[in-house]
Amino acid sequence: MNYPVNPDLMPALMAVFQHVRTRIQSELDCQRLDLTPPDVHVLKLIDEQRGLNLQDLGRQMCRDKALITRKIRELEGRNLVRRERNPSDQRSFQLFLTDEGLAIHQHAEAIMSRVHDELFAPLTPVEQATLVHLLDQCLAAQPLEDI
């Protein structure tokens, strides 16, 4: 069932997203990591899914292959990511973090965790669980190709 939407909902969500992105970027800059929040997400996906290919990375990030390819080249140039030929399909590459990439990723993840903790600390554990449930419910109602 669909209900009328509170007009304050979208501005509130956008304000939270903007606050989180700005705070994370500020912390990344202060630590001189020369990364953006999407860069951190790329490193996280590669770390969690060692051997991930460019197509799957692009799909998970909702970005086209050309943009992902440029980003991976940039991260390779900084010695954070390395590409290896896929042994089961020589036409594709698998992505891995370098040792330096892993160290930078862990540092950036600590920053992101701290920012998230500060943002959600005013909510009780039950309120946090309710928020997660409500957001999951909204996403579950969307067509698969939109998620």
Curated annotation (Swiss-Prot):
Organism listed in the record: Pseudomonas aeruginosa (strain ATCC 15692 / DSM 22644 / CIP 104116 / JCM 14847 / LMG 12228 / 1C / PRS 101 / PAO1)
This chain belongs to the protein called: Multidrug resistance operon repressor
Q: Which PROSITE patterns does this chain map to?
A: HTH_MARR_2 (PS50995)
Show the GO cellular component annotation of the record: protein-DNA complex
* Record carries keyword Transcription: yes
Keyword Transcription on entry: yes
Keywords for this entry?
DNA-binding, Repressor, Transcription, Transcription regulation
A Gene Ontology biological process annotation? Answer: negative regulation of protein secretion
Superkingdom of this protein's organism: Bacteria
Give a short account of what the protein does: Repressor of the mexAB-oprM multidrug resistance operon. Also represses its own expression. Many variants lead to increased expression of the mexAB-oprM operon.
Q: Name one GO molecular function term.
A: DNA-binding transcription repressor activity
Self-association and partners: Homodimer.
SMART domains in UniProt? HTH_MARR
Known Pfam families for this protein?
MarR
Please name the InterPro entries in this protein's record. HTH_MarR-typ, Metal_resp_HTH_trans_reg, WH-like_DNA-bd_sf, WH_DNA-bd_sf
Q: Where is the HTH marR-type domain?
A: 6-140
